[in-house]
């Protein structure tokens, strides 16, 4: 637990998480000092496109007591064993753990990973986590760092599918493929081989909130590739996250689909903050952008694949209530005419960007103790 990556994770998470905030997700549950007796209340607190995510609510509590990993025949008490069961489970941890997976871990539907009350690290030079062809998964309170590429090997996908060969993977920290109703909240992501969060292959109904992203170049990819137009159905909410320090680009980088980027705090980037190709709809609202010092890096946005300056002028990229520092600026285009993007259940109040540092100051893994509010 004394590697430079782990020390950095602890330092940044302490600095970001030292005070209480009142964004609508946190105010739903964080004031309750008895949260540990009512863990599943968390499932009622999501907002945005992933607000219907149930995770393991209504299922049994499953406690991880063993940090070991067997990709094919996981032992009871290990994380992979709980993740691959074919029933709803709310997965908690008996204490602090550093879990180095031997192969990518696939999560079955209707699961919650709830790291509150422990410091749970996944990565450490091993492959990380996949959510593929399932629905209703909540990932909360984990450190995902140092995720690496994997080799060809057999993996237990879940109880129904059994063991299947899994091809080498790129080393993303968290990958969503053809996944629906997913909520990723209050995690700390850094230092992985490829991306930190990838949402692809018609994944939709996703909320990514209250996370800390730092020390990484390619942060978040939404949309598989420019040839995969089925991602037009993708809807993702990116809200109350802290991007930085030391993030390069893709916060997010979108293809097709609809992305609402709301009340996120951006430290200076090295390439760009928000980008995309293949005509995604990007609605930026109430964010705080601080540009790097270099004069040629002030633009928040980058449009990729435009053959001429006018060929992307009809893309709907809108900025409302954003605030800009150190010369940052957002290039808007198009006009959104789709009406309300959210149902009544999904909708949440978005503050002016001036309030965003307060709303995001607890982004990342929280420090939660029994009988005390997080």
Curated annotation (Swiss-Prot):
One BP term from GO: pectin catabolic process
Database matches in Gene3D superfamilies: Single-stranded right-handed beta-helix, Pectin lyase-like
Temperature impact on function: Optimum temperature is 60-70 degrees Celsius.
Domain of life: Eukaryota
Active site: 250
Family matches, as SUPFAM superfamilies: Pectin lyase-like
pH dependence: Optimum pH is 10.
One GO MF term attached to the UniProt entry: metal ion binding
Function description: Has pectate lyase activity.
Family assignment from sequence similarity: Belongs to the polysaccharide lyase 1 family. Amb a subfamily.
The protein's name in its UniProt record: Pectate lyase 1
Organism annotation: Cryptomeria japonica
